[in-house]
């Protein structure tokens, strides 16, 4: 895969995961040009906080993941009016947050790399979805 949009579920797994999917995701992201909406940083921070509070990862692991985050994503995109409009059109199939990733992948004509099986199973999405679990 040359280029992709990557969502927060995939990024959190790549940064803080310990299983086979984390290894696969790290490899895919290293070899690809990765894109994401600006929302990604807030979602990753939120997920890492939850993981620390539930003792899934340590504070140090979360800090290391946050420190690595800026270098993992090649291009971040603002929530432009055009992207928001297209995101809103997808509201019947996925959450607004997930739709931002789908809309960006569609606009860039690249696959969406996700660790979210519910997103991957959503019907009628206009972009290719690659689930890594």
UniProtKB/Swiss-Prot annotation:
Inhibited by EDTA. Its EC number is 3.1.-.-. Keywords: Hydrolase, Magnesium, Metal-binding, Nuclease, Toxin-antitoxin system. It is an enzyme of class 3 (hydrolase). Mg(2+) binds at residues 7, 98. GO terms for molecular function: magnesium ion binding; RNA nuclease activity. InterPro entries: PIN-like_dom_sf, PIN_dom, PIN_Pae0151-like, TypeII_TA_RNase_PINc/VapC, VapC_family. Signal peptide: none annotated. It comes from the Bacteria. It comes from Mycobacterium tuberculosis (strain ATCC 25618 / H37Rv). Its cofactor is Mg(2+). CDD domains: PIN_Pae0151-like (cd09873). It holds the Pfam family PIN. Belongs to the PINc/VapC protein family. This is Ribonuclease VapC1. Toxic component of a type II toxin-antitoxin (TA) system. The cognate antitoxin is VapB1. Has ribonuclease activity.
